[in-house]
A protein has these predicted regions:
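NAD(P)H dinucleotide-binding glycine-rich loop of Rossmann-like/cofactor-binding domains
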Residues: 87-169
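Glycine-rich beta-strand-centered segment in the early N-terminal region that forms part
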Residues: 21-36, 45-92, 133-136
């Protein structure tokens, strides 16, 4: 039995420090958490009595605490985990590398409410943790576990090619990573933002083109967009964006929202446009994302906070106010 400190949400929306006790099963690994990213999804669960956080990074603990059936990790290995914790491993989706769509998938917010990455330790199935490349410090690896995996999966899994033009709406926690990944994939990257305030930063991250949208009736771009990643917490003005989509282009809503997707009908029909759902990356794609980030030196831009009640609340407040540049990272003691 292992006992460790965790940080939970509450009905009042306050962060509560608590304790979790868990046994380590034969196929599980005990991880000393060193860093956790703060994702916008965490905001949606802060009023629930559950341990928060799903962008974890840490170190595998001493060998006698590693599950008896685990042979892939050893003491001191740098590892991370993300949104998914388990699947059935025998359905069609699991057997074809799409375990994120498994009917029995275990996902953050819906399963394992007694632990998360806002904690000093975590115990996860070895099959659902990921080895972090030595060249990526864990403070940068943590936000990649969900934010990086989300944008990489959209770019990687739906036939994006280096010759394609990728549009990215919003330069926040997801958008600033999407710019880097799309640029390093060889795509022409057009960034859309309401104002000019983040233009210089977007260009430094790898954007080829920057377009402001506020007060503009018709967007002017150098070429039609093949893939449009929506990385804002609100739906864009589709009357602005649908006219700049290439025939057969794809729209990717990537942020969590409880609102209905409302979009003009005829432009979708006439342009043979697609609206493509994209969850987080399956394990093979997740590992590929980490290797790609290591090879191309992709790093999130982060702000650090202590992993305490006060630190977590300050981090979440800054994100809520829209002032985070661009991913908050909690540092465990």
């Amino acid at each position: 039995m292992v006992e460790f400190t965790v940080f939970k949400g509450s009905r009042e929306g306050k962060i509560v420090q608590s304790t979790t006790k868990k046994d380590i099963k034969s196929d599980e690994v005990l991880i000393k958490v060193t860093h956790s990213g703060l994702c916008g999804t965490d905001e949606h669960f802060k009023r629930i009595d559950m341990v928060l956080g799903h962008e974890g990074a840490g170190v595998v603990e001493f060998s006698q605490e590693i599950g008896a059936a685990v042979t892939t990790y050893a003491k001191g290995d740098s590892v991370g985990w993300g949104y998914q914790h388990d699947s059935c491993n025998h359905c069609k989706q699991c057997l074809t590398g799409h375990e994120t769509l498994c009917p029995e998938r275990a996902m953050y917010g819906y399963h394992d409410h007694d632990q998360g990455s806002f904690a000093y330790y975590a115990i996860w199935k070895a099959d659902y943790i990921f080895r972090i490349p030595d060249s990526i410090p864990r403070e940068f690896a943590a936000p990649l576990q969900c934010g990086g995996a989300t944008v990489y999966n959209a770019l990687r899994s739906f036939d994006t090619k280096p010759s394609h033009r990728v549009g990215i709406i919003g330069i926040g926690g997801l958008g600033h990573l999407a710019i880097q990944f799309a640029s390093k994939m060889g795509c022409h990257v057009t960034v859309f933002s309401s104002t000019d305030s983040k233009r210089d930063e977007a260009m430094k991250l790898g954007a080829n083109e920057f377009v402001t949208t506020k007060g503009v009736k018709e967007l002017q771009v150098s070429g039609k967009i093949d893939h449009l990643l929506i990385c804002t917490s609100f739906q864009p003005d589709w009357k602005q964006f649908l006219p700049i989509m290439a025939p057969g282009g794809t729209l990717y809503p990537l942020t969590v929202s409880q609102d209905d997707l409302t979009i003009p009908y005829m432009p979708i029909l006439e342009g043979e446009l697609k609206v493509q759902g994209s969850l987080v990356a399956a394990r093979a794609v997740h590992n590929e994302m980490l290797a790609f980030a290591a090879q191309h030196q992709i790093r999130p831009l982060i702000e650090k906070f202590p992993m305490t009640v006060e630190g977590i609340e300050a981090c979440m407040k800054k994100l809520e106010e829209g002032n985070m540049r661009y991913r908050g990272v909690l540092i465990a003691p």
